[in-house]
Amino acid sequence: MKDYFKRAANAALRGAVIGAAAGSAALFLIAPGSSTKRQRAPFMGTNCAHRGLHSRDKSVPENSLEAFRLAAEAGYGIELDVQLSKDGQVVVFHDDTLDRVCGVHARVDELTLSELRELRLCGTDQTIPLFTEVLDVVRCRSAIICELKDGKRNRELCEKTYEIISDYSGDICIESFNPLIVAWFRFHAKDLLRGQLAQPMRRYDADTVSAPTAYALGHTLFNFIARPQFIAYRIGFRPLSVRLSEYMGAMRVGWTSHEPRNEAGRDTVIFEFYKPRVKFK
């Protein structure tokens, strides 16, 4: 009988040790990086206009200089997207392809800046802007969340984007869906607030992202690579791993909001198609 209880106790102890090790490993994977109050302050309680203050009827196109001007004048923060043209210019544009916004069947990275300049956004007189042109329009009036789009020249995009940011005196942070892009800033730009964009597993493109990778991305299991200081998660259900990361200190950023109630429980909100208050905390 004593041997039975001894074996049971040993088995329970082994189970506890294994469970503790597994729990520690999981926490290691999802733990965020630390950030300072100064880094967080411009974005805390801030409503950021998604791709600028563009309009539903497209009379003010997304990611246009006019959309960014309107957002800055209203006092909102700004979210925007950067990627490279064929000739290595950092341009502000969301999609990989030009079909939806410009009506041209081509990829952004297949055209030079001069070729992109000939296109119009949503049939208006607005053109695809350079990142530097957007910063010239904003003039340090808005906190900017800069998303780096995943592509074939990520290192070049990171280097050129950071070079531009380094010459700007306004408040900017970066984010990306690709943890390796976020990790580049972890090791090369420690002064810059960085965030991991994520969404539920089912939202990733099954044609380009495998199921295991989509699961890991959706549960922010690559945080150990980038140690993001905020998690920008699609508004809706957030898995336990994301909530634990937030509990451990990651700023809570939600996208894309279409109603003011999404401010609840978040530190920063990325919104579109309505005009919320500028600051909510």
Describe the function of each predicted region:
Residues K2-K281:
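Phosphate-group recognition and catalysis centered on beta-loop-alpha active-site segments
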